[in-house]
Design a protein with these regions (language model features):
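12-transmembrane solute porter fold
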Residues: 39-54, 61-62, 75, 286-456
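Hydrophobic transmembrane architecture of multi-pass small-molecule transporters
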Residues: 431-556
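Hydrophobic transmembrane-helix bundles of small-molecule transporters
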Residues: 187-305, 309-312, 316
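Extracytoplasmic
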Residues: 37-96, 131, 146-147, 317-321
Length: 556
């Protein structure tokens, strides 16, 4: 097995500490700098690839309630589509990295986009929930390479000195755009044809991306024999572990954690598969994943930061979106707000890009946490009368903060992995995928469970005061039942209808209070993260010998 390779983004040779073999083909000379026009085309191609992959996932999440009628399914059953998509997606990039190194970048790119187009075409044959679940599983497998290609096309547009600063920052900004765009374009698509319009649009994007990959080549790294037989078994165990865990986290809150036995089976299967993978990997001299390096102190610190990002960024992607649905707001009523979120994400990404070119890189983290903490706190003051107009400022703050948070961490982690050698990028991918894919599901499941528990708590507190002996309660019941007075003459039935309507209002208010609690928790988590970050920066300033490596580094 060879561990001598080349950075796939810029063609620079990377030599780890203990190389064991030479690549199977000569090293390519560094590419000539691109003209501004050609670089702009590569950047636009990167955006297209990110949108193709991201909209394929987010269009479903944005229309989960509208699709129940199209597929004749309940909310819990529709959630299987998200679980089927994320199960293979969570681990696929790890295998694809080694496949790309062994069989060549060009072949990898062309085959990847063809597979995604075929997966998109399969949507034509979807007729019910079962066929949709199978197609979503295949789409999740086919979509994993597109995010990799999106990164590579963005990095290709910049010289080596700017790849891990400007290139990486813009690429990560592109990953945040598909969620608000999905909410913006969903209403006209659903009006055109429901489920069929959504998958037709997805297929159209895939067909647009197809000629891009064939006409715009990437700098090919040298191929090397990096796949061993044990790598296949280790990856299968990792895929099973991540896949079972993804399904467990996606569906656990909906079916409830302790109510159905198969959730426990999924969790046990995930733990068993990952444990067996660890047992197989630890004794290997050249493992698929260097677990000792992955669990080093520096990487655990980075993983903690990435997990914090997933928790605080879920304020917008999950908690706020569910809050709107709880208030009965549909995508048509939130289009303007998501347009503002989109613009704020772009602004935050561009500001972070500028900061990445200076020595004030850590300022991006500080600004991001301040914006998210303040935005989430403003959202925690919501009521049942709150509408999108009252949340424009807070959601724009959260969007800008989320776009600024990730690039400095990713740049530092990328540079650290490259300093150890290109094979360590696989280990870095494990950390990134676990914290972003599985971490996002953990954040969604934890916050969703928290909202459910707090709703029950607030309901019990509110119901304690619903007594007909209270004249205000009796008056409210009479007012609510008045609309039925012309069709129901029985006084007892009329009061029962009034109590039912009052109970619905109590449940609505309890849900609003529960979401306010969740927003407040996110705000407090962001504030705690900010305090820890400022303490860490102060420590580094006054104790120079403990300072970490520079946040932005480029391979030599």
């Amino acid at each position: 097995m060879s561990t001598v390779t080349e950075d796939s983004a810029n063609g620079n040779r990377i030599a780890p500490e203990n190389p064991v073999a030479a690549p199977t083909q000569p090293i390519q000379p560094p590419p000539e700098p691109m003209s501004p026009a050609r670089a702009a085309i590569y950047m636009a191609s990167s955006l297209l690839l990110f949108l193709t992959q991201g909209l394929g996932m987010n269009l479903l999440n944005a229309n989960i309630y509208q699709l129940q009628g199209s597929l004749s399914a309940t909310t819990s059953e529709i959630a299987w589509l998200s679980a089927a998509y994320i199960a293979p997606y969570a681990s696929m990039s790890i295998a694809l990295f080694k496949i790309r190194m062994q069989y060549g970048l060009r072949r990898f790119a062309e085959l990847s986009i063809v597979c995604f187009v075929l997966a998109s075409v399969l949507n034509i044959f979807v007729s019910d929930l079962h066929s949709a679940t199978v197609v979503r599983f295949l789409s999740g497998m086919a979509a994993a390479p597109l995010s990799t290609l999106g990164f590579l096309y963005m990095l290709e547009a910049f010289p080596a000195a700017r790849k891990l600063s400007v290139g990486l920052s813009l690429a990560l900004m592109n990953t945040t755009l598909s969620a608000p765009i999905a909410r913006i374009i969903s209403p006209p698509l659903m009006d055109l044809g429901g489920w069929h319009a959504l998958y037709t649009f997805e297929m159209g994007l895939a067909l647009m991306a197809l000629p891009v990959v064939y006409l715009l080549p990437l700098t090919p790294p040298p191929r090397a024999n990096v796949i061993q037989k044990m790598d296949i078994l280790s990856y299968l165990l990792l895929a099973i572990g991540f896949g079972c865990l993804a399904v467990f986290l996606t569906l656990g809150r909906l079916y409830w954690w302790f109510e159905v036995p198969w959730l426990g089976v999924l969790l046990a299967g995930s733990i068993a598969a990952l444990t067996l993978m660890v047992v197989l990997e630890l004794p290997r001299k050249m493992p698929l994943i260097d677990l000792r390096w992955v669990f080093s102190r520096e990487n655990m610190h980075m993983a903690g930061i990435l997990l914090l990002f997933r928790v605080v960024s879920s304020e917008q992607t999950t908690t706020a979106a569910n809050f709107y649905m709880q208030l009965g707001l549909i995508n048509d009523q939130t289009q303007t707000m998501y347009t503002i979120i989109l613009l704020a994400s772009i602004a935050g990404g561009l500001v972070c890009t500028v900061l990445m070119l200076t020595r004030y890189v850590e300022t991006a983290h500080v600004l991001a946490l301040v914006l998210i903490a303040c935005g989430a706190f403003l959202d925690s003051q919501s009521t049942s009368l709150t509408r999108p107009e009252q949340m424009y400022l807070s959601q724009a703050m959260v969007a800008a903060g989320a776009a600024m948070f990730l690039p400095p961490v990713m740049s530092k982690g990328f540079a650290t992995a490259l300093a150890k050698g290109a094979p360590f990028l696989v280990n870095f991918l494990v950390i990134f995928l676990f914290t972003q894919s599985i971490g996002a599901l953990v954040a969604q499941a934890a916050l969703g469970t928290f909202v459910t528990l707090r709703e029950k708590f607030h309901s019990n507190v509110l119901v304690e005061h619903i007594l007909l002996t209270n004249p205000f309660v009796a008056q409210r019941v009479s007012q609510l039942s008045g609309s039925y007075g012309k069709v129901i003459t029985d006084k007892s039935l009329l009061n029962a209808e009034g109590l039912q309507l009052l109970g619905q209002q109590v449940t609505r208010e309890a849900n609003v209070l529960a979401y306010n609690d969740a927003f407040l928790v996110i705000s407090v988590a962001s504030a705690i993260g900010l305090v820890l970050l400022l303490g860490h920066l102060t420590w580094r300033r006054f104790v120079p010998h403990t300072a970490a490596a520079p946040a932005v580094a480029t391979p030599s």
